[in-house]
Amino acid sequence: MDRRKKPLDVAASSLVDLKAELFRKQEEFKKEKLLKDAGIFAKPKPSNKKPSIWTKQNTGVAKRAEKDIEQKAEEDQTLDQSRKKLEEKAKLYEKMTKGDFPDEETEDLYLVDFTQKIIDKQREVQELYQNEAAIKTLEKETDDEEIEPEMEIPPPEDPDEEWVDYVDSLGRSRRCMKKDLPSILKMDQELQGKRLDPDGNTLLSEDMKRELQRQQWEKEEEEALRKPMGPIHYEDIRENEARQLGVGYFAFSRDQDLRHKQRATLDMLREQTLDQRTKREQLKEKRKAALESRLSKLRARKVKKLREEGLEEEAERLENGEVKDTTSPVEAEPEVPRPSRKVEVVIQERRDTKPGVPYVREWDKGKELMFGQWSKKQEELRDERDPEFAPPSDYFMGQKKDDGYSSQNLNSPETSPGKTEPEISENQKKLSVQASTHRAEVVPPSVQAYSNNVQGGLAPAEASGSDAEDGSTSAETDSSDEQDGVPSAHPLHLWCSDTCQPSNAGLWLWPLRI
């Protein structure tokens, strides 16, 4: 079936709507054409489409951008103003250094003596010329000496390797190779950046700006002429200076009456500050005095308590401590005593806790088993030792031997139970005398005299009843010391340099060398 002959199934209402829409568009086109021919441009119809989230800007962005532009313009304006002021000052300074003053009165206003500076500069130029002349004369005098000619620098083989001078963006003279010059200039331009035109936001030309500035200066000069003659202050000559002087600077008014009022206000504030400072210091002194009185009361209470307890020395020291710290002069350091060569002998007697009970030190408690095994081992070693390798018998004369030797001495006829205690003490004295005579050649005479005095002074004391009791307990103490691993205190020795002197005075003698 042919498609072209297929009937369209369209309602009559849709055809009417289509004709109406076509007629409306034709009428709008005719109106726009007539308005365009008449020179009237119709405004486009606003679209009611909702903006997307990507096209929507934050609130206040446009205002902040405008504010930044205004601030940038103000900064550029202040920069131009300060630059112009500096250029004017530089020109004025050049004129002054050359001596071009308008009149003599203005010359007296400046603190710098430019006339003297000109004279000094002329003197420096004259001295420079004189030095050059002296150098030339010296060169003429040294013509006889051989001077090697300077070697000329050969030209470069490659023209790109030639050294050239250029000026960078900061006005500095630089030198580089010719082949590197384009890259350096390009980098200099990138570092310099594009500067914004300061006059882009204003419609005033340079001539108009200069005219406004001239009018302002004329106005200021007229006001200065109307004022009576008087002192010149810093605000009078500042002339809208762009420099910021900080928070410590107070800009006084140029009017004299208002200036005096401002100065009076500042003086009043200064006096108030001084009064508050003095009041604060007085309050601090009162607090300090109250604290000192409280401390003195506490100190007196403590002194009273110490005196009640019977500590008079500490109480006096506490009372005099404050006076000594505040009023006493600095005492001289005590002289350091010189070392003497004398030998001081200190006699120390071992005291047991109870008579008949051996004294055990704190660090020796619990060591009985260990020292017992050690003494047993030593006894076995002595039994295994060859008598030929034993030490001489002189080493053990007048001394108690360890476990095996002490038992032999106790079983010997000299210390047999059949003898009395006075006989044992007499035998011990004989042994000590024999040892002293044997070592008389080695012991110094001072030590011999001291040992004789000790033996002579203690001999009658041994006959007393108290020493007899000590002699009766000597065997017990010796046995206890041998068990503890501590050497017996009965045979006493006086150690002096490399020799020893036995003594049976019942004391340990330890020498202290000063």
UniProtKB/Swiss-Prot annotation:
InterPro entries referenced in this protein's UniProt entry, alphabetically: CCDC174-like
Alphabetical UniProt keywords: Coiled coil, Nucleus
Region annotation (Disordered) ranges: 42-83, 137-162, 270-291, 306-490
Regions of compositional bias (Basic and acidic residues) in chain numbering: 63-83, 335-354, 376-388, 420-429
Coiled-coil regions listed in the entry: 66-98, 203-227, 266-321
Biased composition range(s): Acidic residues: 141-162
Major site of localization recorded for this protein: nucleus
Compartment list: Nucleus
Chain's role: Probably involved in neuronal development.
Protein name as it appears in the record: Coiled-coil domain-containing protein 174
Originating species: Gallus gallus
Gene: CCDC174
